[in-house]
Amino acid sequence: MKTMFLLALLAFTATSAVAQLYTTCSQGYGQCQQQPQPQPQPQPQMNTCAAFLQQCSQTPHVQTQMWQASGCQLVRQQCCQPLAQISEQARCQAVCSVAQIIMRQQQGQSFGQPQQQVPVEIMRMVLQTLPLMCRVNIPQYCTTTPCSTITPAIYSIPMTATCAGGAC
């Protein structure tokens, strides 16, 4: 329970920082240029969602082994609760993160490598399974927009601002 609270607090803090940066820069307080930092490993709850889909999903091509029902229920709760508490835009990015984690695990890639386009089969499975299992709404544009073009949210690369003239 403490872990869930800490994860929720971390997600809230990250969302607030990104929103504050966006608001400050978009209102014209200086000329801000956003620079991506090196790609971090995905947030723990997205790893949990990937594990949940791979281990507990009823989808045969994803399932590696069935966990005990109680184990799946706990992992489902750890995945779905934070997912339900974020914006739809952030959910779309979270779906992309989960799909990328699954793709990298299947291909044996590490998280420091450049991002590749997620195969259609993996993206379709995540888009069909995760919203149903977590009972959350995923925006329609997530089904047609490539992950590489979706605006970064709390589960993606954090952005820092470099402001010209010391203002921002």
UniProtKB/Swiss-Prot annotation:
<dbReference type="InterPro" id="IPR036312">
    <property type="entry name" value="Bifun_inhib/LTP/seed_sf"/>
</dbReference>
<keyword id="KW-1015">Disulfide bond</keyword>
<keyword id="KW-0732">Signal</keyword>
<dbReference type="InterPro" id="IPR001954">
    <property type="entry name" value="Glia_glutenin"/>
</dbReference>
<keyword id="KW-0708">Seed storage protein</keyword>
<protein>
    <recommendedName>
        <fullName>Avenin-like a1</fullName>
    </recommendedName>
</protein>
<comment type="function">
    <text>Seed storage protein. Not integrated in the gluten polymer through disulfide bonds, unless incorporated by reduction and reoxidation during dough making. Increases dough strength and bread volume, but decreases dough stability when added into a base wheat flour.</text>
</comment>
<dbReference type="GO" id="GO:0045735">
    <property type="term" value="F:nutrient reservoir activity"/>
</dbReference>
<comment type="similarity">
    <text>Belongs to the prolamin family.</text>
</comment>
<dbReference type="Pfam" id="PF13016">
    <property type="entry name" value="Gliadin"/>
</dbReference>
<feature type="signal peptide">
    <location>
        <begin position="1"/>
        <end position="19"/>
    </location>
</feature>
<keyword id="KW-0758">Storage protein</keyword>
<dbReference type="InterPro" id="IPR016140">
    <property type="entry name" value="Bifunc_inhib/LTP/seed_store"/>
</dbReference>
